[in-house]
From Swiss-Prot:
<comment type="subunit">
    <text>Part of the 50S ribosomal subunit.</text>
</comment>
<keyword id="KW-0699">rRNA-binding</keyword>
<dbReference type="GO" id="GO:0003735">
    <property type="term" value="F:structural constituent of ribosome"/>
</dbReference>
<dbReference type="InterPro" id="IPR013005">
    <property type="entry name" value="Ribosomal_uL4-like"/>
</dbReference>
<protein>
    <recommendedName>
        <fullName>Large ribosomal subunit protein uL4</fullName>
    </recommendedName>
</protein>
<dbReference type="GO" id="GO:0006412">
    <property type="term" value="P:translation"/>
</dbReference>
<feature type="compositionally biased region" description="Basic residues">
    <location>
        <begin position="60"/>
        <end position="71"/>
    </location>
</feature>
<keyword id="KW-0694">RNA-binding</keyword>
<comment type="similarity">
    <text>Belongs to the universal ribosomal protein uL4 family.</text>
</comment>
<dbReference type="InterPro" id="IPR023574">
    <property type="entry name" value="Ribosomal_uL4_dom_sf"/>
</dbReference>
<dbReference type="Pfam" id="PF00573">
    <property type="entry name" value="Ribosomal_L4"/>
</dbReference>
<dbReference type="GO" id="GO:1990904">
    <property type="term" value="C:ribonucleoprotein complex"/>
</dbReference>
<feature type="region of interest" description="Disordered">
    <location>
        <begin position="54"/>
        <end position="76"/>
    </location>
</feature>
<keyword id="KW-0689">Ribosomal protein</keyword>
<dbReference type="GO" id="GO:0019843">
    <property type="term" value="F:rRNA binding"/>
</dbReference>
<dbReference type="InterPro" id="IPR002136">
    <property type="entry name" value="Ribosomal_uL4"/>
</dbReference>
<keyword id="KW-0687">Ribonucleoprotein</keyword>
Length: 207
């Protein structure tokens, strides 16, 4: 267990929180992390690519010329692959690129990603944001006060509409819940801001 500073949105220290080293301070497993990122990227692919083979191309129902006597090579249809406008051979067909990964590996990847951010000092814990209404300007000021880079992942305990709407129009800022936290979002961000309650929830799930 290790103690981490908890900040207020004005940058002052609010207190500290004790979090498990098995979640936030492990030696990152790069190979598992790489596999988890590839898995997520693969599942994001649409896989709607398609071409028409010789049976799907329109036309070509009759034989273009008789079998014998013309001196030309025999042909059965003008939609054979060697013809212009003919069907495609072994072309792409619609498919899903998604594949599965064992739960233990997925959780190890998450712990590795979080530990990497902590190790690089790109991990900030705040007590809470406490927005009573969506305020983009105020949220931008919070990021400036906390000295955050352009690409930031904000993690809240549960869905916070005011935080989501405040951050929605700021380029490079993404909001997630503790339950929806994933490896691709963490590694894509330069820094992670997480509320104290969200950090506890993540520790509970991954610990």
């Amino acid at each position: 267990m290790a103690n981490y500073d908890v900040l207020k949105v004005d940058g002052s220290k609010s207190g500290s929180v004790e979090l498990s080293d098995s979640v936030f301070a492990i030696e990152p497993n790069n190979s598992v992390l790489f596999e988890a990122i590839n898995l997520q990227r693969a599942s994001l692919r649409q896989g709607t690519h398609a071409v028409k083979n010789r049976s799907a191309v329109r036309g070509g129902g009759r034989k273009p010329w008789r079998q014998k006597g013309t001196g030309r090579a025999r042909q059965g249809t003008i939609r054979a692959p060697q013809w212009r406008g003919g069907g495609i051979v072994f072309g792409p067909t619609p498919r899903s690129y998604a594949y599965k990964m064992p739960k233990k590996m997925r959780r190890l990847a998450l712990r590795s990603a979080l530990s990497f951010k902590v190790k690089e000092n790109n991990f900030t814990i705040v007590d809470n944001f406490g927005f009573e209404a969506p305020k983009t300007k105020e949220f931008k000021n919070v990021l400036t006060t906390l000295e955050q880079p352009k690409k930031v992942l904000v993690v809240t305990d549960s869905e916070d509409v005011n935080v989501e709407l405040s951050a929605r129009n700021i380029p490079g800022v993404q909001v997630s819940t503790a339950q929806g936290l994933n490896v691709l979002d963490i590694t894509s961000a330069d820094s992670v801001i997480i509320t104290e309650s969200a950090a506890k929830k993540v520790e509970e799930v991954l610990g």
